[in-house]
Amino acid sequence: MRQGMILGENGEKMSKSRGNVINPDDIVREIGADAFRVYEMFMGAFDQAIPWSTQGARGCYRFLDRVWKLQNLLTEEEELSEALKASVHGTIKKVSEDYEKMKFNTAIAAMMSLVNEIYARGSVTRGELRALLLLLNPAAPHITEEIWQQQALSDQPIYRSQWPSYDEKAMEQQETEIAVQICGKIKMKLMVPSSYGKEETERFVLENDAVKALIAGCLLYTSPRPRD
């Protein structure tokens, strides 16, 4: 349950007289219950009044679609790959702590970042997919259970499986935390390889699903340099 208020897309309180009421049944029919749940958890802190964004909700649908298509990249390897070991353990820690603190928006953002890393690598092990699905299950129970069963990731349902644990030593990697600021406000933080330069960092941030959802419908403008 949200403690804050979901406003209409125009930023005003929803009411029939204003014509800005969002019917959840219509949203579920369009993008499904899982995407609806994920967006409600991702759209912002639970104690804040936040305007509804149809584009943002569709962005969460696209995120879950990418999770579904990870099955096309699945290998037979049961363990974590060396390339993603640090990221997976870091994501487990981040999501676990954020769930405990009810910071669901940043937990979802962390999982979106992990999915981006998996696609950048081009493959996902069974161990990596298993960890991701366990983390995502509280937010998207239907699609995660479906993938879990299709890929036979365990002999029991996902909701009865043990929550993943993380290893602090495995998280040691040369990364830098950067703050993503939109319209003058810090919206989220991302871990970026320390070796990245300015252009690589910008590309990494703009290709992140969480950032895409936050800037959906926004016009990005870079002011020209002043003339000498």
Predicted ranges, named:
Residues 14-15, 187:
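Generic structural signal for well-ordered beta-strand positions
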Residues 195-214:
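A short, contiguous, amphipathic alpha-helix enriched in charged residues
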Residues 6-7:
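Catalytic phosphate-handling regions of large nucleic-acid enzymes and associated NTPases
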Residues 1-3, 172-176, 217-218:
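A short, compositionally biased
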Residues 21-25, 30, 205-207:
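Extended active-site and interfacial segments that coordinate phosphate-rich ligands
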Residues 26-197:
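Helix-rich, typically C-terminal accessory recognition domains appended to large enzymatic cores
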Residues 221-228:
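Conserved small/polar residues in nucleotide/adenosyl-binding loops
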